[in-house]
Amino acid sequence: MMHSFKTRLAVGVLAASLALCAQAADVTGAGASFIYPVMSKWSADYNAATKKQVNYQSIGSGGGIAQIKAASVDFGSSDAPLKPEELAAAGLAQFPSVIGGVVPVVNVPGIAAGTLKLDGKTLGDIFLGKVSTWNDPAIAALNPGVKLPEGKITVVHRSDGSGTSFNFTNYLSKVNPDWKGKVGEGTAVQWPTGIGGKGNEGVAAYVKQIKGGIGYVELSYALQNKMAYTAMKNAAGKFVQPSDETFAAAANSADWGTAKDFYLVMTNAAGDNAWPITATNFILVQKKPKNPAGLKNTLEFFRWVYTKGDAQAKQLDYVPLPDTLVTQIEAYWAKNLPH
């Protein structure tokens, strides 16, 4: 009972703070830290072009879902798509905003970005605590000729409800049977080992601080923080580097036309050049909002994103949505939202 009260109190306090932000903004949003770098750039450029202000709070996908369900913001953002039945129950609509990638990041002396190779099974075993030193035979077998230290591995995971975690654990569940059986997938799971950081920002900070650390973040966080990310073996058996090109290769396998309410997860995608932990960010809005002007302004903002925001996304190593998908989104708006 006390835990439930504390949860309701925390949501209420956050809602109140977001409401204060709303008074000064034309559009308010909250959710995934995954897209915060590009959302910040979009918002600044949109303001410069239109004089309209978009206030986006990076609170994690779980927080974004809670806030849009509570109608505390004009839109929520999540890297974990909601299933059609959950959307219907909450009176929500959902559509994609941009595509990016989740990358393992490490702090291992002598290991530069892109030099360490991992596969899904070994990555899962590290996060299970089964592989606990950097010179473990499983890691050494994937990295012949690389001098690996004897040091202990410290796992860093998310402490908050996270779409980044959803895509990471969804991938591990597809490629590591032990992970699927013992942990599974979700925005929040019972982590077998490690320490928790809040947001992509928190995970990046901990990994940078902890010698021997490993975590997972969206690529732009790794690049901005000059962190060493790993290469990954994909579903085709090829080792690939994270980039907008390998994210786009994974996205090419997505069949959005058959995805009701755009419910689609593209981890472990086919293709020789596909990054295996590629993810989509989704925007959630109320179908019958208390503030119709907020929804109208939200759709105007994302219409601008789809037509004028590609360069900003590419600059930060995200992948803009293809024109065919944008056309589907506009048709979805016309069918499901007031206009």
Residue ranges and their predicted role:
Residues 24-339:
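Flexible loop/hinge segments at secondary-structure junctions
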Residues 1-11:
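Bacterial N-terminal signal peptides that target proteins for export
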Residues 10-19:
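Bacterial N-terminal signal peptides
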